[in-house]
């Protein structure tokens, strides 16, 4: 029974990520999440940029928390990872942290809330791999458009 549920979740994840890839990111990374906002009969995309302070990996129910400071107030927003309301997720910079949950940032302001940028070669390799994947997806879309 559980295997059937896992299989269905896997299929749904593949279907939801077919048009937009989900980049690999971790707590400490600065993310730009483009969210689809519907106002009346208009739909627009709103950017939400902040630090990922937590990530919950739970298959289709995976989510992540992004924190930013807006007009001097800390604002946190929980995003379901595979939500159709998320247009795209972009990693702005990779942070170097030693915790999985960065809830201690809630109590910090200013310089003490800064996160060091990751300078290891691994982040460069990950970024290069993501760019290559994005280019491959774009090429596939162009090829599909030419066929039609």
UniProtKB/Swiss-Prot annotation:
It comes from the Bacteria. The keyword Ribonucleoprotein applies. NCBIfam families: rplS_bact (TIGR01024). This is Large ribosomal subunit protein bL19. One of its GO terms (cellular component) is cytosolic large ribosomal subunit. Transmembrane segments: none annotated. It comes from Paramagnetospirillum magneticum (strain ATCC 700264 / AMB-1). InterPro entries: Ribosomal_bL19 (IPR001857), Ribosomal_bL19_CS (IPR018257), Ribosomal_bL19_sf (IPR038657), Translation_prot_SH3-like_sf (IPR008991). GO terms for molecular function: structural constituent of ribosome. This protein is located at the 30S-50S ribosomal subunit interface and may play a role in the structure and function of the aminoacyl-tRNA binding site. Keywords: Ribonucleoprotein, Ribosomal protein. The keyword Kinase does not apply. Belongs to the bacterial ribosomal protein bL19 family. One of its GO terms (biological process) is translation. Pfam families: Ribosomal_L19.
């Amino acid at each position: 029974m559980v295997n059937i549920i896992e299989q269905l979740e896997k299929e749904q994840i593949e279907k939801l990520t077919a048009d937009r890839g989900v980049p690999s990111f971790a707590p400490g990374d600065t993310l730009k999440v483009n969210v689809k906002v519907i106002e009346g009969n208009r739909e627009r995309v709103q950017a939400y940029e902040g630090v990922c302070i937590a990530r919950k990996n739970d298959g289709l129910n995976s989510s992540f928390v992004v924190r930013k400071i807006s007009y001097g107030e800390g604002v946190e927003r929980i995003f379901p990872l595979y939500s159709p309301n998320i247009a795209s997720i972009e990693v702005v910079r990779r942070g170097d942290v030693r915790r999985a949950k960065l809830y201690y940032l809630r109590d910090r302001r200013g310089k003490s809330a800064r996160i060091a940028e990751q300078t290891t070669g691994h982040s460069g390799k990950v970024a290069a791999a993501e760019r290559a994947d994005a280019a491959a997806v774009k090429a596939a879309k162009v090829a599909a458009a030419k066929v039609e």
